[in-house]
Amino acid sequence: MQIFVKTLTGKTITLEVESSDTIDNVKAKIQDKEGIPPDQQRLIFAGKQLEDGRTLADYNIQKESTLHLVLRLRGGAKKRKKKTYTKPKKQKHKHKKVKLAVLQFYKVDDATGKVTRLRKECPNADCGAGTFMANHFDRHYCGKCGLTYVYNQKA
């Protein structure tokens, strides 16, 4: 029977084989026609690499089937050296979750039961109601919009 072998260059070779022929025999015939040594040849059919000891019938290769010839690659990527770090890894800041943290922004008067705000609220329309400004030693600062009020310095 006749089979086709497509090479890397796109050239198609026709080979006269029998279904009982081994893959070794096919590789030898390719060497006769193309001059590529069998140890460098890899034959692929239906997405599978053909093993040397098996026959064409094992892979269900019939007349006028096309095998793909690719060359065997040697070696691989260069092995990389593992990095050694001189300093220990920096610890990430962990956010502390405080339950009912909102209560520290308000104070309830015991006598009247009136609620007063302990922090200044941001007047910017982008921030909206309930956005408090941070108290620093010399200023009030809104973390949302960046608005800053600086205290008057006494000379």
Swiss-Prot record:
| Ranges of residues in domain Ubiquitin-like | 1-76
Arranged from A to Z, the UniProt key words for this protein are: Cytoplasm, Isopeptide bond, Metal-binding, Nucleus, Ribonucleoprotein, Ribosomal protein, Ubl conjugation, Zinc, Zinc-finger
**Record cross-link Glycyl lysine isopeptide (Lys-Gly) (interchain with G-Cter in ubiquitin), residues:** K48
Where are the C4-type Zn fingers located?
Answer: 122-145
User: Crosslink Glycyl lysine isopeptide (Gly-Lys) (interchain with K-? in acceptor proteins) sits at which residues?
Assistant: G76
Tell me which Pfam families the record gives: Ribosomal_S27 (PF01599), ubiquitin (PF00240)
- Which InterPro entries does this one have? Ribosomal_eS31 (IPR002906), Ribosomal_eS31_euk-type_sf (IPR038582), Ribosomal_zn-bd (IPR011332), Ubiquitin-like_dom (IPR000626), Ubiquitin-like_domsf (IPR029071), Ubiquitin_CS (IPR019954), Ubiquitin_dom (IPR019956), Ubiquitin_ubiquitin-like (IPR050158)
- GO cellular component labels: cytoplasm; nucleus; ribonucleoprotein complex; ribosome
Q: What other remark does the UniProt record contain for this protein?
A: Ubiquitin is generally synthesized as a polyubiquitin precursor with tandem head to tail repeats. Often, there are one to three additional amino acids after the last repeat, removed in the mature protein. Alternatively, ubiquitin extension protein is synthesized as a single copy of ubiquitin fused to a ribosomal protein (either eL40 or eS31) or to an ubiquitin-related protein (either RUB1 or RUB2). Following translation, extension protein is cleaved from ubiquitin.
Protein family according to the UniProt entry: In the N-terminal section; belongs to the ubiquitin family. In the C-terminal section; belongs to the eukaryotic ribosomal protein eS31 family.
Descriptive protein name: Ubiquitin-ribosomal protein eS31z fusion protein
Q: Which organism is it from?
A: Hordeum vulgare
